[in-house]
Amino acid sequence: MKILLLGDYSNLHWTLAEGLRQLGHEATVVSDGDYWKGYQRDVNLKRRSTGRWDSLRYVWDCIRLLPRLKGYDVVQLVNPLFLDLKPEKVLPFYKYLRKRNGKMFVGAFGMDYYWVKTCLDCRTFRYSDFNIGPRSRADEPQNRRLIDEWLNGAKGRLCQRVMEDCDGIPAGLYEYFAVYQQWFPEKTTFIPAPLQLPPIGGEPQTEKADVLPLSGGDRRDGGAEVLPLSGGDRGGLTFFIGIQRGRSAYKGTDVMLRALERVKAKYPERCEVVKAESVPFEQYKRMMAGSDVLLDQLYSYTPAMNALLAMAQGLVVVGGGEPENYEILGETELRPIVNVLPSEDDVFLKLENLVLHPEQIPLLKRQGLEYVRRHHDPVKVAERYLDFWQQTPPRRRS
């Protein structure tokens, strides 16, 4: 098959393309690298800035690329807003792709109209990016902006139009599947995210790298801040937390960082904290290496790509590991994720337990590696995508 993957989040499309190629298919990834993260792609479609001339150049780049974006058996968009343009300008590009290619699929991989609307019902999820129990998080500044854009604005209208028209919707996490099953059950399926894995027999390094802490507030590797140990004791745990500027409250990393700092203050000789703030993907992976524990998202039921990457590298993940995550995978044995509830105190207690009982770390690391090998192998995931694409009947085009 000839497959076009347009846009990328968390390296999902690039890793999927590599799995498809191993199966003998032709896969092309066109993306901007997910902004500053710099993910690999075959065709670079990056907007340099929002200035007038760079905006005109970007539109011209999109138009000039169109002749190369036709004749594919399958086109999969990472999101209804798959170009860095205003929603009303994206729709003509969607129509062009729809008319000149085979089947059209749109991923449920991130922020969109249906995600916001469903989370705000405060019933579908016990907690999410937009609710904790019956309490809405709509008044938080970052969430207010997302609601205005996706629920009440042009982005939402584009999303509804595209999702109603497309042939199928693969959901990459349990939460996205739970949302889209309510709206488009006949054309939604769950497929785990693909992840590049260490080779069998080539286990990831699970001993701490020899990185000496710097004095407080110093930075290393371009974006890492190391909060040093007191007393020089390196027998404790190294905790790693990645922070995206502007999304800390939305993802809950602000709460997790506060809990982690409390643990460090209480056990200064037993833990080290490494923070990475908005660094490119390859640099992020290097900075993560040698840590013991990754703090992931607070309001998630499931591990997203950063957490899966950490487990593949031999880290323990603290984040989303609710029963629904294991059930949708059919996983009845492994429980590698330290599940946390959306409260600072719960995160503190779970982290404190790891510090006080480090003997559980080796088992969690081994289970994490086996977990990603079982469920996120790129070739196995690519096979599931191929089955979904081939079995999905084409819909009448609007």
Residue spans of the language-model regions?
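Helix-loop-beta element that forms the nucleotide-linked donor phosphate-binding surface
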Residues: Q160-D165, I169-A171, Y176-L195
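Acceptor-binding helix/loop patch of EC 2.4 sugar-transfer enzymes
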Residues: Y39-R41, L45-K46, V106-N152, G246, ...
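Membrane-proximal helix-turn-helix segments that form the acceptor-binding/catalytic region
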Residues: I63-L66, K70, F93-K99, D129-G168
